[in-house]
């Protein structure tokens, strides 16, 4: 579960390394974001000559969480860390052209099919 002030790793090649959640989108007093939810983030750590710079405010979709995701068959998929993929603020398409690490099947809707197709592994 991701909330305000949570630090996340970035799972794409946009140039950011670490981001911090500053708002969970989708409701006036929404507290937690799970896998597949869109959040507002600020870049805390970035590599030189990347597509994004430190201090930029962007949207991101959560792709991995330590708390995991519960499936309807009762199974629970957990990850070692929290990770997100950065999105353009206007059209919510990914900034990076590559995705690192596995992503879950919960992202499989019309909005995030691009992330599913770029990911090396879908759990």
Curated annotation (Swiss-Prot):
GO terms for molecular function: large ribosomal subunit rRNA binding; structural constituent of ribosome. Pfam families: Ribosomal_L14. CDD domains: Ribosomal_uL14. The keyword Ribonucleoprotein applies. GO terms for cellular component: cytosolic large ribosomal subunit. SUPFAM superfamilies: Ribosomal protein L14. Keywords: Ribonucleoprotein, Ribosomal protein, RNA-binding, rRNA-binding. Part of the 50S ribosomal subunit. Forms a cluster with proteins L3 and L19. In the 70S ribosome, L14 and L19 interact and together make contacts with the 16S rRNA in bridges B5 and B8. Belongs to the universal ribosomal protein uL14 family. This is Large ribosomal subunit protein uL14. It comes from Chromohalobacter salexigens (strain ATCC BAA-138 / DSM 3043 / CIP 106854 / NCIMB 13768 / 1H11). The lineage of its organism: Bacteria, Pseudomonadati, Pseudomonadota, Gammaproteobacteria, Oceanospirillales.
